């Protein structure tokens, strides 16, 4: 019998796994995909939000702000890409200024540092490529960008290094409470565990409804993105938002940690939990809205497009559900934006709650570091050549110029 089974190998599930690996517990993470980071965590905006948008007193505000504060140190421990580039929320007419003031006040109450409203020459000095129609912006200097798949993989690798086991291609089809804990029926057999932590994304409500007294309903919300060539990566330095609306934070323009520009997302609710196709209409909308912020955006340089799903709770809920709804069953439900930003804090919280429930003791030999990671794209050509001469796997695979992977990178 396991002590804990974590369901879901996205950013939150892997953050939970890494934090639980601090404890003397037998932990297994199960993921229905072939690897970690194959769902929402691989297809999102890659933003570490500052925390000014989340409603005061909400779980989104609490975990966003704490997660943002944890992220930089976590990136150093686990060696994944992180850059504090700041963010701007644009306002295109004077009538929108009260909304900016509201975001400023909300962020200050939430504990976000350094917020200010900028106008005129100050705004243009920050980002010269912005539309001349932008009259003001909320500036959030603590906003950042990460590599979401690099982050999720790093969390998983460190968890595995500290003893967590992983089972892929394993779909939990049914879960039920037992006297000893929980029985999980999967497509690859039955598992017994003392406790469960569900971080199942758009499938989280299905599991919740099998064991909890109330009913939850998740509506998958699809967002479409365009990725631009690296030659355009310097057009903006900061993440550029427009004023948020009822469907989310709207279409953004942001640099990526790899040097590209990213545009999106759209926001379309759908019944399917696995449909991530892009549409001509969706991509056109994202591009049109992005050009409202940055008119000179060279959309001829789009090199790929993609879509991802976020787990939006229906029935008017606008917050995360994080906790222990029934004894021994912990969950992170409805993790949409700012889920990636919140993942380190959610992971720490749920791990501490589960460890307390199981009366676990901390390990004396927990290793927080991920070492010896080679980032080839950041090395000078001579160093790459030396590595390839020492190990031909470093030079055996060549793909398109988006990210310059090699066979050795994949083996690592």
Outline where the language-model segments fall.
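Dinucleotide-binding Rossmann-like beta1-alpha1 core, especially the glycine-rich loop
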Residues: 46-126, 135, 250-251, 391
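Glycine-rich FAD pyrophosphate-binding loop
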Residues: 22-41
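Single conserved hydrophobic/aromatic residue that forms the stacking wall/gate
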Residues: 400-412
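N-terminal Rossmann-like FAD-binding beta1-loop-alpha1 element of flavoenzymes
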Residues: 2-28
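Flavin-dependent oxidoreductases
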Residues: 15, 175-180, 184-264, 268-277, ...
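C-terminal catalytic lobe of FAD-dependent flavoproteins
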Residues: 257-258, 274-382, 387-396
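Short beta-strand to alpha-helix junction loop
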Residues: 62-65, 93-99, 139-157, 276-281, ...
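Helical element adjacent to the flavin cofactor pocket in flavoenzyme catalytic cores
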Residues: 142-194
């Amino acid at each position: 019998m396991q002590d804990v089974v974590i369901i879901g190998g996205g950013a939150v599930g892997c953050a939970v796994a890494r934090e639980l690996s601090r404890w003397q517990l037998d932990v297994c993470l199960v993921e229905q995909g072939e690897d970690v980071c194959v769902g929402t965590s691989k297809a999102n905006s890659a933003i570490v939000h500052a925390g000014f948008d989340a409603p005061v007193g909400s779980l989104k505000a609490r975990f966003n702000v704490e997660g943002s504060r944890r992220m930089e140190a976590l990136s150093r421990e686990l060696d994944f890409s992180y850059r504090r580039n700041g963010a701007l929320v644009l306002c295109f007419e004077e009538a929108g200024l009260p909304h900016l003031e509201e975001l400023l006040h909300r962020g200050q109450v939430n504990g976000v540092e350094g917020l200010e409203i900028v106008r005129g020459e100050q705004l243009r000095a920050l980002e010269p490529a912005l539309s001349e129609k932008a009259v003001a912006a909320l500036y959030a200097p603590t906003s950042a960008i990460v590599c979401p798949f690099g982050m999720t993989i790093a969390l998983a690798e460190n968890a595995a290094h500290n003893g967590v086991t992983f089972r892929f291609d394993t779909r939990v089809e049914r879960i039920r409470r037992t006297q000893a804990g929980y029985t999980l029926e999967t497509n690859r057999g039955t598992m017994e565990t003392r406790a469960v932590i569900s971080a199942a994304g758009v499938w989280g409500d299905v599991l919740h409804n099998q064991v909890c007294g109330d009913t939850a309903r998740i509506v998958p919300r699809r967002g479409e993105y365009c990725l631009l060539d690296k030659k355009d990566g310097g057009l903006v330095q900061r993440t550029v938002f427009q004023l948020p609306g009822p469907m989310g934070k709207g279409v953004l323009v942001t640099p990526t940690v790899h040097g590209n520009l990213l545009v999106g997302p759209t926001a379309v609710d759908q019944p399917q939990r696995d449909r991530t196709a892009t549409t001509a209409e969706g991509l056109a909308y994202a591009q049109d809205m992005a050009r409202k912020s940055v008119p000179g955006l060279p959309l001829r340089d789009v090199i790929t497009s993609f879509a991802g799903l976020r787990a939006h709770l229906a029935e008017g809920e606008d917050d995360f559900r994080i906790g222990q709804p029934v004894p021994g069953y912990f969950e992170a439900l409805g993790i949409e934006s700012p889920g990636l930003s919140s993942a380190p804090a959610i992971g720490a919280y749920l791990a501490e709650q589960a460890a307390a429930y199981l009366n676990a003791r901390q390990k004396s030999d927990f290793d927080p570091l991920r070492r010896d990671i080679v980032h080839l794209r950041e090395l000078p050509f001579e160093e790459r050549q030396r590595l390839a001469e020492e190990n031909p796997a470093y030079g055996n695979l060549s793909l398109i110029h988006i990210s310059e992977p090699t066979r050795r990178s994949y083996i690592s």
